[in-house]
Amino acid sequence: MTTATLSDQAQLELVRTRHVRQMELTVRILQHILARVDDATATTLRDPDDGAKGWTTLEVLCHLRDYDEIFYRRAQMMAAGGTPDLPGYDHEALAIERRYNEQDPAAVLAALVESRARFVDFFQALTPAQWQATGIHPERGLFTMTDAAMQVGLHDVLHIEQITRILASA
């Protein structure tokens, strides 16, 4: 190993730091994308890849807000210890039950920004022992705290692409 080579632990810490930074940036990207999207556009244009059943920009934004909270609660459960079984959720049912497309886009985005700041603070405050925490994900099995940090930004990117595709269809 040369002096320019990072240890495995240092590399892992760098990956974690970068994913937490990505969590901050993806919300800022959403704010920029949505800054000039009016309510009518946010609630009428649908994902062209899914036809009439495709989600609107507002529905995608509500999904991001709700899953930010879900991901946060799962990470909290893991940090508390004991390799918990993490709860699963039906995202389509949530969209219907919570009437996503009837919500206020500005309020939804503000709630996501607030939730994300709390989530970033959570990750930045984790101890080395808490970073080692695991849970059992309902779809993926064994799930690490690093997986949890990576999931947030990757989930955001998936849906940012979806939102830009919806808006580009206008």
Identify the role of each PLM range:
Residues 1-29:
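Extreme N-terminal tail/first-helix region
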Residues 11-21, 43-49, 81, 102-103, ...:
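Solvent-exposed interaction patches of small proteins and small membrane subunits
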Residues 13-24, 54-61, 105-109, 146-149:
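Amphipathic, non-membrane alpha-helical segments in soluble helical-bundle scaffolds
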Residues 2, 6, 46-94, 120, ...:
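Short, contiguous alpha-helical
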Residues 22-26, 31-35, 95-132, 152:
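Acidic/histidine-rich alpha-helical segments that form the ligand environment
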